[in-house]
Amino acid sequence: MSQSKPGLQGDGKSGQGSSQSALTLAALGVVFGDIGTSPLYAFKEAFTGTHGLAVGPENVLAALSALLWAVIVIVAIKYVWVVLSHDNDGEGGVLALTALAHRVMGDQSRRSRFVVAAGVFAAALFYGDAIITPAISVLSAVEGMSIATPEFEHFIVPITIGILIGLFSIQMKGTSVVGKLFGPVTIVWFLCIAWAGVASIVQTPMVLQAVNPLHALRFAVQHTDKAFFLLSAVFLAMTGAEALYADMGHFGSRAVRLGWYGLVFPALMLNYFGQGALLLRDASAASNPFFLLAAPSWLLVFVVLATAATVIASQATISGAYSMTLQASRLGYLPRVRVLHTSDQEQGQIYIPSVNWLMLLAVIALVLAFKSSGALAAAYGIAVSGTMLITTMLVGFVVYLGRSRARGLTLSALACFALLEIGFFASNLTKLEQGGWLPLTLGAIIFIALMTWRDGTQLVAEHRRRLDIPMSDLMSSPMSGVPVVSGTAVYLTSDPKLVPNALFHNLKHFKVMHEQTVFLHVINENTPYVHEGERLRLKPMCNGVWALDMHFGFREQPDIPAALKRLTPDADGEIPNLDPMTTSFFVARVQVVDGPGGLSAWRCALFGWMSRQSASAATYYKLPANQVVELGTQVVL
């Protein structure tokens, strides 16, 4: 039940949406910001971190070689080539991948439940990273001002907070507008860091020896302990890789690949090698090799450009968080959220106000608590390395069960990726005491919330199945004594086999039935989009009563009135009269009450709070306010 998203991927020849070049430009401004600013701190961390190496030719070449080949294997091959090829009908991100793996495995297997839990935990870790990225990225750039003008040091935190407030405030304009604004700046950024790298490499060409992977392998064999700690610094060069996959739904895999291979990867490597060449000439430059790479007359220009680039880096994780939240809500791991579509052409470009402002508050709290990028560096990496490892596992399940032609080769490659990522994750765990606890704690809290919502909604459904009246009993019972009023009643139901609570209360309190009744069941599919021809299924139940199934993909905004306009007659050639003047929509709002069994008291309280934050069914499904009747019901968990 899937279809391609119009105007998103730019792979076709039609004019639906932006051209491929415009999509690639926008992708540069949104997708690559995070990984594109890693030169600000990644290579420096190898020599100035808690377990920093001594600056010398052997160590510099080994660190560069390890960084180069790690980026090639994990980002250029695994993500840009392998992972982007395993999308969920054009949609990326770990939750979309989890839904795909779940669909391939089936609902009932124990292995399937494990995969779903792992995928949800990876999504929770991604949220932790999405909160840390804006804080560390903008801080690292603004700190460059203290190199140019030491008096600026006391203003680093206030300036950082001001920049972050501005960034989150323009999100309502949409990722398309933001991307078009940031895209040209990102191109200038990559060209400038590449130019600075080339200028340094020309002065010390021996740095090119690091292209040989033997430098990294020899260092790993001779200095195993140091190599293990080096992995956590090298990993910082790849922290934006997951955003490439998470944001794929905004711009399509082709735009991501063109941007990576055409500009981003060459520019990053030239700059890293330029920093390495600088350290070979001047060991004292290890304190901040990125900014010291620039000529003194260009330092302020680089600081301003780096600040702009780190704002863009934050955009990658912000837009990724929007996508993740929408998917989590559609797949049943979060309550209904208010989603604004910011483009008439690009369906994947969205803005979620609640997520936007919660992230801003969390990011500001981190900046005030840690105050420097160096303090946050230890916290950076654990969440992403865990998400990467789970992504590899999920792709492995999809490939194994999907039985593709290149299954053996792909699984072998994924096994190699997993071994390397286990090393990265283990190395990052050494930073737990220095701040690594933060993303794991954030991830655990979000994971508990996601699983609590899922478990709570399942318990509510079980409660209904246990206590509610089966629909078959209603259809078989005589209704001749019930007064009939004119008009059409549309009852929203979460389980078509049971009588909707709203109808039960309507009969109990008002003791009437409508002339025509429609039981509407909205089904969220595990695919991003649904063909219009497969969206509606109308089935007659008895005279004047219909069951209507309405299908939406997890990336679509459900719009019941718009979908009903496309309703066609049932098998008997009949169709309910849905005239707005005579049609009413009946919805039930559930109030959760703590009771014995089911969820623990604190999880029940959490579920109740999340339920109260949920957008109303009328707002969520875009029902006309003057046609909605809402009836409340209590559920004891």
Q: What is each stretch, according to the model?
A:
Residues 1-637:
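The structured alpha-helical core of multi-pass membrane proteins
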